[in-house]
């Protein structure tokens, strides 16, 4: 009887370990794909041009919603929106080196905020942005409920 229980226990732990390894591989694969997405986006000439044009208008006009900003968003926004839809992202951000959120696909209240000295400086997004400024390592930001916990 004891031997049967021990055998069943070993089999159960073996199955649990197998499931754990499968899940681990799935999670690692998911994050590997997301890092690949980031590398493609960050090196994409279109994204670089979008950030430059939208940021230039944002700085020149003192924020979002003005004519130059709207024109830049009309030019580059559809491509960014399509990219987000294709890859299942809820939102994509363009953030200047100064910490200004100059564009978001979702255009929520974080648009126009500053991640260094604004109300979002202590948010998960603000902390991750500040961490990205101080490291040469690629920082991956999850925009989700988990972000609020970081």
Give each language-model segment a name.
Residues 1-74, 81-90, 97, 138-140:
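Juxtamembrane extracytoplasmic/periplasmic/luminal helical "stalk" adjacent to the first N-terminal
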Residues 74-150:
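Extracytoplasmic/periplasmic ligand-binding sensor regions of membrane-associated signaling proteins
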């Amino acid at each position: 009887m004891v031997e049967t229980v021990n055998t069943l226990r070993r089999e159960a732990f073996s199955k649990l370990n197998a499931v754990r390894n499968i899940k681990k591989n799935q999670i690692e694969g998911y994050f590997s794909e997301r890092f690949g997405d980031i590398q493609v986006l960050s090196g994409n000439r279109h994204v670089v041009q979008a950030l430059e044009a939208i940021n230039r208008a944002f700085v020149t006009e003192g924020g979002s919603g003005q004519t130059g900003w709207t024109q830049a968003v009309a030019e580059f926004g559809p491509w960014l929106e399509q990219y987000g839809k294709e890859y299942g992202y809820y939102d994509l951000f363009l953030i200047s080196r100064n910490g200004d959120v100059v564009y978001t696909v979702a255009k929520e209240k974080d648009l126009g905020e500053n991640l260094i000295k604004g109300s979002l400086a202590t948010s998960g997004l603000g902390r991750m942005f500040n961490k990205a400024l101080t490291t040469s390592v690629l920082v991956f930001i999850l925009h989700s409920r988990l972000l609020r916990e970081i």
